[in-house]
C-alpha cells in the first residue's frame, strides 16, 4: 500500500507548550510531557531553518480521487472552522486503530473468526479515517493554518495507519493460516509506504499513482464486508482454474501491486535525484535510505525463520505491530530528512526492540521469546511516540503554532 495521497491535502499546525496544545499544563501534564519528550531536541537549528523553507510538491492523481472530491468538499463544509486540521487527522487515526485492535483482540493469530460487527466496525473505521484524512488539508487551507508541521503530522499518521490497515486486512481474510503470505503482505505494505517517501527524498516531489491509497482503502473496505457476508467458507473456497484459496487472491494482488509500485519508485530513485550528481535532495546517496528499511526487514525475516518456538506463527499480530512501529519511526525520520534536507543516520533507538529479539535467539532463548516480544513491542511503541511528540513540540515551538488548536486570530478571521 503506497499510502501517500493524503498529504496533498494540508500542512497542519502545532504548539510550543505541549503535545496537545491546550494551553497551560497541569502537574500531571508536565510529568507526561517529560516522559514523552526526548532529553535533547531531535532537530538542529539548521534543520529547523531548512524546514521553514520547505515547500510541498506533488504530481499525478489517482483513479478515484476526482470522483471522491465532491464528497470530500461536502464533508469539509460540515466541519466547524475552529477545528484544527491535525485534530481531524488524529481523530480518524484513533478510530482506525481502535477498530483494528478489536480484530486483533478476537483474532490474535489471524486464523479465528471475529464477530460480524467487528468486521463492520473495521470497515467503517477505515472509511472514517480515509474521509477525515482527505479533508484535513482542505480544512487547513480553509482556516489559513497550513504549515510544514501539518505535512509531517499527516505523513506520520499515515505511516502508523498503514501498519494497522494491512494487519486488519490479513485478519479479515484469515491469512494467519498461511504465515509466509501474511508476513509478506504486511511487510510489503510498510515497504511500499517507505519507498513512496524514499523517492520523494530523492526527487523532492511526492508522486501519486493511478492506483493509490484511496483505491487500496476502498478495496480493503470491500474485503471486510466480504468477511461479513461470506465468512470463513468464502475465504476458504477454491478459485476455479487457479486452484488456490480465495484468501490468497488479496495476497497475489499485493504481489502485483508491489512489483508495479516498486518499479515506478525505483525508476525515480535511480534517475530522478535532484541533488548534486543525481543525489538526494539533501545531497546524500540515493541508496542510503535502503539501509534502514533493509535492516528492519532483514531482522524480521531472521527472527521469524530462526525462532524455535514459532514466534511469528503463534503471535503474528504482536510481531507485525512490533516491527510496524519500528518501520513507522524510520519512515517518519525519512520524511523529516526530506523536509529538512538532511542526512538520515543509521544508528537509531528504533532498532533496540528487534535487537532484543535477535540477541535472545542468539543466546538460545535465555528468556521466553514471547516475553521478549512483548518487551520489544512496548519499547518500540514508546520509542515511536516519544520521537513524534518531541518533533511536533519542537517544530511547534519554532513556528509559534499549535498542534491541535488553531490560533485565535486565525480562527476569528476565518469565522468572519
From Swiss-Prot:
Q: From the UniProt record, give the pathway where this protein acts.
A: Phospholipid metabolism; phosphatidylethanolamine biosynthesis; phosphatidylethanolamine from ethanolamine: step 3/3; Phospholipid metabolism; phosphatidylcholine biosynthesis; phosphatidylcholine from phosphocholine: step 2/2
Query: Which InterPro entries did the record assign?
Result: CDP-OH_P_trans (IPR000462), CDP-OH_PTrfase_TM_dom (IPR043130), CDP_ALCOHOL_P_TRANSF_CS (IPR048254), CHOPT (IPR014472)
Q: Where is this region: Disordered?
A: 1-20
Q: Give the residues the record marks as binding Mg(2+) 2.
A: 133, 154, 158
Q: Which reaction does it catalyse?
A: CDP-ethanolamine + a 1,2-diacyl-sn-glycerol = a 1,2-diacyl-sn-glycero-3-phosphoethanolamine + CMP + H(+); CDP-choline + a 1,2-diacyl-sn-glycerol = a 1,2-diacyl-sn-glycero-3-phosphocholine + CMP + H(+); 1-O-alkyl-2-acyl-sn-glycerol + CDP-choline = a 1-O-alkyl-2-acyl-sn-glycero-3-phosphocholine + CMP + H(+); a 1-O-(1Z-alkenyl)-2-acyl-sn-glycerol + CDP-choline = a 1-O-(1Z-alkenyl)-2-acyl-sn-glycero-3-phosphocholine + CMP + H(+)
Q: Where is this site: Increases basicity of active site His?
A: 151
Q: Give the principal location in a single coarse category.
A: endoplasmic reticulum
Modification sites for Phosphothreonine? 40
The transmembrane segments are 89-108, 116-133, 156-176, 180-199, 210-230, 246-267, 286-306, 315-334, 349-363, 368-388
Q: Which residues are glycosylated?
A: 144
Q: Which Pfam families match?
A: CDP-OH_P_transf
Q: Its function?
A: Catalyzes both phosphatidylcholine and phosphatidylethanolamine biosynthesis from CDP-choline and CDP-ethanolamine, respectively. Involved in protein-dependent process of phospholipid transport to distribute phosphatidyl choline to the lumenal surface. Has a higher cholinephosphotransferase activity than ethanolaminephosphotransferase activity.
For this entry, the protein name equals: Choline/ethanolaminephosphotransferase 1
| Organism taxonomic ancestry | Eukaryota, Metazoa, Chordata, Craniata, Vertebrata
